[in-house]
Amino acid sequence: ITPWNYPLLQVSWKVGPALAAGNTFVLKQAELTPHTAMLLMAALKECGLPDGVGNLITGAGANCGNPLSQHPDVDMVSFTGGLVTGKIIAKNAAETVKRTALELGGKNPNVIFADADFDVAVDNALNGAFFHSGQVCSAGSRIVVEESLHDKFVDALVERANKIKICL
C-alpha cells in the first residue's frame, strides 16, 4: 500500500523486491495517484509478467486498503504513509497475524554542531525541510542546533528561506 508522493518510486520499492523474492503482489496505490501504478502494471505486462503475479486495486483506503490488510489470504502487508493509517493497517493485520512492514512518517531532526561547515549545514537544513514541499517521509522537520550557533543559524536559515521562490 503506497502513498501519493513519489508514486513510481514508492511502488517500485515495494513491487521490485516482491518479484525478486518470487512472490505475487497486490498493489494498492494512493487514490490520488492511481495512474502511475496503472502505467507500471501495463509495462510489467508488456515485459511478460504472467497474469495473476501482479495485481492492482484502486480506490480509497477504507474501501480497498482495509479489506486488503484484513484478508486472510494476504501473508504480508507493506505500507508507506502516515501514522494514523499505519496503526489501522497494523491492527487489521494483527487479526490474522500477518507480517507487516510499516514505513511511517517521522520527525527527522537535523542536528547541527558548532564545528560543522556553517553554509553547508544551513543549505542542507533548508533543503531537508522544504524539498518536495516538505512532503517526504524523511523531511527534516526539526532542527537541533548547538546553543552557541543558534542565533546565527536561525538568522541565516530565515534569510535563505525567504528567498525560496514558490510556484515558478
Regions found by a protein language model. Name each.
Residues N55-S78:
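A structured beta-alpha segment of the ubiquitous adenosine-cofactor-binding alpha/beta core
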Residues S12-W13, M38-L39, S69, I88-N92, ...:
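Short amphipathic alpha-helical segments
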Residues Y6, L32-H35, A62-N63, L83-V84, ...:
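Short alpha-helical
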Residues L27, T33, T58, L102, ...:
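Hydrophobic residues in well-ordered beta-strands that form the structural core
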Residues V15-G16, G65, G86:
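Generic hydrophobic/aromatic pocket-lining and core-packing "Φ" positions
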Residues N23, K28-A30, T58, T80, ...:
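Short beta->alpha connector loops at strand-helix junctions that form conserved
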Residues M76, G82-L168:
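ALDH superfamily catalytic-core signature
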Residues I1-D51, D75, V97, D119:
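Conserved small-residue-rich beta-alpha loop and adjacent elements
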